Amino acid sequence: TKIFALLALHALLVSGTTAAIIPQCSLAPNAIIPQFIPPVTALGNEHLAVQAIRLQQVLSASILQQPIAQLQQHFLAHLTVQTITRRRQQQQQQQQQQQQFLSSLSALAVRNQAAYLQQQLLTSNPHSLANAAAYQQQQQLQLAMANPTAYVQQQLLLSNPQAATNAATYLQQQQFQQILPALSQLAMANPTAYLQQQQLLPINQLALANTDAYLQQQQLLPVNPLVVANPLVAAFLQQQQLSSFNQISLVNPALSWQQPIIGGAIF
């Protein structure tokens, strides 16, 4: 019996040193051993299976951590690429908007220089950039205080679409409408003088050929009672003489040369 007991103990010892089974069960003694044995002896007496499991755990942790770091790097690189492309797109859009704005400004400068200058003043003034409506109102008030006539003309030009397309023609029409009552009174009082005055409204070619005669004709304008009574008539007549073409010189050149004399007789 003693011999069998010794053989059984020997078999247990041999199987304990060579066994590589049940790693979960081997963890419990491994946790208990360091309480009674120093760490060096515990590490030396640790089973090979436990060492293999620990090595496997360390390797698996390192393998799992590497893809996470790589994914983070790829994600950061993707974010940087997206930000760079977004900034480039924003810059391209800003450049396109600037080009469109410059083209519209050039077209506005060709069509309406006054509006172009006002827009340039708005962009150059920081107060106008902060509040363009208040700045425009302030400018309009200053214009109304400095020159009420120009302010009224500007308001009429802004309110009338025909005036926006052709401001000069619109102003001439407004001036003509203002002097229509005076002209109608002249036509009723003296039809001959009215017809002669209508013939003298276009530009006098003699002013280009003979400046002295034209100046004499202009000096005789204040003698006209109609001009003295209504200064707008004088301004309108002068404007018409300087802005339109004399049809009389085409039909009858002799009458065109006599035109200053007729004007002196009338005025």
From Swiss-Prot:
Keywords: Seed storage protein, Signal, Storage protein. Pfam families: Zein. The keyword Mitochondrion does not apply. Residues 1-19 form the signal peptide. GO terms for molecular function: nutrient reservoir activity. Belongs to the zein family. Major seed storage prolamin. PANTHER family: ALPHA KAFIRIN. This is Kafirin PSK8. It comes from Sorghum bicolor (Sorghum).
